[in-house]
């Protein structure tokens, strides 16, 4: 993916090295990626293990290793109890921080890491639960969301939300669109055009599913941020194809042949849509990348390849660097 080269270059030039934690140190794929990231100077990497005996001898110099069993302290427990006040007893907190996904999230919350990549041995829910409970969503947004970066040749688009929110309401949809637009800015997109998708194009259909998209569009247009253009509701053919758009939606203000971002109305549509583009359309799908958290945490597919983990890690490090700069 051509955007990876640009991000790598920016990370290598940065005087500020982000700290990335991998909770799943027992995985050979994680060790390979950790070594690569550290060697290339893309981040300061930390890898978690259960015990000292699990730490391999093939880690490159500079990688920090943490054996959780020997590194649970009262400060961490007290912070977790404060964050989860009224929901946890101390013995429950002690058990939680022994889990690598929770320990990693605590390192991020405590500022000992800037970001986390996890999921080879965890479901998406088990990766995101500690992130949502401990790191929490950013105060600007009502929910967390996800994006896929879809690439084919010189074409590059962002699809959202294809992994997290089952049936977002109009407020959620507007937040999903804004998060994706800000993510696109971080990836150096300019004059960003966002299509709010539906089975209806500006009133050609009706029903609650259409209403929530049109309400989200109205909310977004009131946002009125320079460099961002939101249009809809519209069908996918109208959004993607300029000739169809000219017929179905002549008042649409999109100037590009194709908009940059496609916001799906629910998880059914989004998940099916990105997989059709990937399998039938020949697009490479990078992600999902999680948006809306106060600090970056990204989820890996349990079938992720070394290259998948590497690309996700680079983007996660970059997300952390962008948050540092804001």
Predicted regions and their residues:
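Anion-binding alpha/beta catalytic cores of soluble intermediary-metabolism enzymes, centered on
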Residues: 1-256, 260-326
């Amino acid at each position: 993916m051509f955007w990876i080269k640009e991000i790598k270059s920016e990370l290598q030039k940065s005087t500020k090295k982000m700290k990335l934690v991998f909770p799943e140190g027992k995985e050979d794929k994680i060790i390979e990626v950790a070594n690569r990231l550290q060697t290339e100077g893309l981040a300061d990497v930390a890898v978690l293990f259960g015990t000292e005996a699990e730490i391999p001898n093939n880690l490159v110099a500079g990688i920090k290793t943490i054996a959780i069993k020997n590194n649970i302290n009262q400060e961490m427990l007290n912070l977790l109890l404060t964050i989860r006040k009224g929901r946890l007893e101390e013995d429950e907190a002690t058990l939680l921080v022994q889990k690598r996904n929770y320990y990693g999230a605590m390192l991020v919350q405590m500022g000992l890491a800037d970001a986390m990549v996890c999921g080879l041995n965890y479901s998406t829910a088990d990766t995101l639960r500690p992130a949502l409970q401990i790191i929490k969503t950013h105060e600007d947004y009502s929910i967390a969301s996800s994006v896929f970066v879809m690439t084919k040749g010189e074409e590059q688009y962002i699809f959202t939300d294809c992994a997290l929110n089952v049936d977002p309401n109009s407020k959620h949809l507007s937040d999903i669109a804004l998060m994706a637009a800000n993510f696109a800015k971080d990836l150096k997109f300019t004059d960003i055009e966002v299509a709010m998708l539906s089975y209806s194009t500006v009133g050609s259909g009706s029903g609650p599913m259409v209403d929530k998209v049109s309400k989200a569009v109205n909310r977004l247009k009131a946002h009125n941020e320079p460099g961002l253009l939101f249009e809809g509701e519209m069908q996918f053919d109208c959004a993607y194809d300029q000739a169809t758009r000219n017929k179905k939606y002549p008042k649409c203000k999109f100037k590009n042949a194709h908009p940059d971002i496609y916001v799906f109305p629910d998880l059914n549509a989004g998940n099916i849509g990105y997989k059709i583009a990937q399998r039938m359309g020949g697009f490479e799908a990078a992600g999902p990348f999680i948006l809306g958290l106060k600090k970056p945490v990204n989820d890996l597919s349990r079938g992720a390849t070394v290259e998948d983990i590497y690309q996700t890690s680079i983007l996660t490090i970059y997300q952390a660097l962008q948050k540092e700069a804001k």
